[in-house]
Amino acid sequence: MSQLSSTLKRYTESARYTDAHYAKSGYGAYTPSSYGANLAASLLEKEKLGFKPVPTSSFLTRPRTYGPSSLLDYDRGRPLLRPDITGGGKRAESQTRGTERPLGSGLSGGSGFPYGVTNNCLSYLPINAYDQGVTLTQKLDSQSDLARDFSSLRTSDSYRIDPRNLGRSPMLARTRKELCTLQGLYQTASCPEYLVDYLENYGRKGSASQVPSQAPPSRVPEIISPTYRPIGRYTLWETGKGQAPGPSRSSSPGRDGMNSKSAQGLAGLRNLGNTCFMNSILQCLSNTRELRDYCLQRLYMRDLHHGSNAHTALVEEFAKLIQTIWTSSPNDVVSPSEFKTQIQRYAPRFVGYNQQDAQEFLRFLLDGLHNEVNRVTLRPKSNPENLDHLPDDEKGRQMWRKYLEREDSRIGDLFVGQLKSSLTCTDCGYCSTVFDPFWDLSLPIAKRGYPEVTLMDCMRLFTKEDVLDGDEKPTCCRCRGRKRCIKKFSIQRFPKILVLHLKRFSESRIRTSKLTTFVNFPLRDLDLREFASENTNHAVYNLYAVSNHSGTTMGGHYTAYCRSPGTGEWHTFNDSSVTPMSSSQVRTSDAYLLFYELASPPSRM
């Protein structure tokens, strides 16, 4: 996968995404972290960045007020807890252990490259026909003209350009741009439906000034002329290579005997250009049973806000995408371009075709969905009250109640749990507790000198007692001074869907590296009761999805292993390719995000 530039500077300007509704702090004290802290400010420091001029033409034609501020200093009163960087105080490390990770770094690359726009940046901007040396009318005469154009470029449907030569040959780079343009024209001429869809979205024929080009991919697609079939606002691309346009579908070997019920949810997702991180997470969420039903049964409609300032586009496009996946045949490939448009409006860091981190994408996506279906329309004023006199269990319940007064959605019902952090003074024995909501847990990978560790080893390392001494000494409110303390984490409230992030990304002053340690995790009956802060019998989980990252920190690829909520069978989702797999193949050293669902009591007998 090619290395691309960072998010365009213009989409990280805080003024363009600032909403007064998001600029008010509400629930408790908020300590910024890498996920929710001053995103634009850290990106725009001139000493860190070397931005080149951005074209005046833009996909977003005017400043938007959609979604939260890109500064993300406040998340409508709820902290966006990024588990990879601790907050200002030692108590802020409520969901992670390990070193800080700089913004923009991830397993999918980015840490080894400067921010900015490279010379050959493939941006999400319309391509001007004049700049590309072709015009719409010249290239729509006939398919024979297009064939000659491809021939003059010494290319074919399967031609590949070595990206290593692009920097050495400006003419070759220009040829690649022309190839992308001609590709869109070829599709237009060969598929009348494509032209109709294009004209409906971008203007009638004769008034269009841009070439109907696809969003530039990171490489020349294998299918120059795929079968095109529109469904609603989404596009289904048949997977047959070299097919003639038409309504027929290519058959996949071994699937002819599958009935429609067993085949549901097995559509692939088209890679739009370094979007494997997005496709991997979307397939994992598509196989989350209750979230899938929430979209398929259109239950989200009753939670949408219909005011003049309401933002609902992200959840609507997400639901439509899930509906398309589950109503398509296994031979279909769904293009998530409409969804990508909305997620990059909500989180401008995903504008363009950069390599991104799957966990960061999951955090932004869940937060955006939660905000749009939050049942709380009018948040109460924050009235801090002292709960230290209450027993820990009662204090945890009160803190959870206060959280739900401000943040209450179906998304939160599924993914949000509560973490308990305790500090015990070694001098006087006083113990103070803090309760924080969490969306996932970032687990350090235990290093024991062996090539293999277990998931329970990682959980024990996450919850083990740490001694805070020296410069790390906190202030004891009883001793009224900085004292040596013992810190410990435990889980106060277990979520229905538990997402475990394996911290394979290791930072050092010299370089960034990826840990390839094999983590042995159970597929069934993950018993986490030993990590509960109070006695509970409802803390056993079953695995249903894994987001995998293969490769290095300089470049890699994301895939997903998912168990169908209907059939219980496992499949590999590799962008547009979906293949069956055995449950014995799920455990690999590429596992990055583990999705567990809370087991029902009968399954634990």
From Swiss-Prot:
Main localization (coarse): cytoplasm
InterPro entries: Papain-like_cys_pep_sf, Peptidase_C19_UCH, Ub_carboxyl-term_hydrolase, USP_CS, USP_dom
Reactions performed catalytically: Thiol-dependent hydrolysis of ester, thioester, amide, peptide and isopeptide bonds formed by the C-terminal Gly of ubiquitin (a 76-residue protein attached to proteins as an intracellular targeting signal)
Gene3D superfamilies for this protein: Cysteine proteinases
GO MF entries: cyclin binding; cysteine-type deubiquitinase activity; cysteine-type endopeptidase activity; identical protein binding; metal ion binding; ubiquitin protein ligase binding
Description of how the protein assembles with itself and partners: Homooligomer. Found in trimeric complex with MDM2 and MDM4 and USP2. Interacts with CCND1; the interaction is direct and promotes its stabilization by antagonizing ubiquitin-dependent degradation. Interacts (via N-terminus and C-terminus) with MDM2. Interacts with MDM4. Interacts with PER1. Interacts with KCNQ1; counteracts the NEDD4L-specific down-regulation of I(Ks) and restore plasma membrane localization of KCNQ1. Isoform 4: Interacts with NHERF4 and CLTC.
Name the UniProt record assigns to this protein: Ubiquitin carboxyl-terminal hydrolase 2
Organism: Homo sapiens (Human)
